[in-house]
Amino acid sequence: MALEIESQGLFAERNIPVLYTGLGKVNAAYRLARALAEHRAQHGVLPTVVNFGTVGSPKLSAGSVVACHRFVQRDMDVTGLGFALGTTPFEDVPPTLEFAPLFSDLPQGICGTGDRFETGKPLVDCDVIDMEGYALAKVCHLEGAAFGAVKFVTDGADGNAGVDWQANLPRAARAFVEHYARLLEG
């Protein structure tokens, strides 16, 4: 989860372990890489990483919950050098990162990540828009950790996104707690 405000204190009340990464791809990648290294040093294995987070979507209604196991970058643009939008040049990591689904009972969606609070339709094909998912997925891909995400749609990625995001945080936090409990049961 990027921000403590997204959990509305519900994770702390229930002693649910959570890593708050901070906003954006760099913060997310750095904090998760450190946490995975520490976990591997202490336990000898990597945990399954689940990203609970809020998203905008021009396709899905506010209040929707979607599971993501495919992730793309919506702001990687090296088209001027002939590369496809969303592709990081000169590396072997595919532009779409895909993992085994962790939440097959939920609607599935593609998460488009970028370091900008989106208020319009993204230029890459994705169902939901966030600021950390692809970075977390890439760290897990490179480290060999299982990864998935549960995303709560707070807004339509439009001109009202900021207000709608804040208004829907309590609903999002309750949904995250519910899906965390289901993950433990399943």
Located regions from the model:
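Gly/serine-rich nucleotide phosphate-binding loop at the start of the catalytic core
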Residues: 3-5
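Glycine-rich phosphate- or other oxyanion-binding loops that anchor nucleotides, phosphorylated ligands
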Residues: 7-186
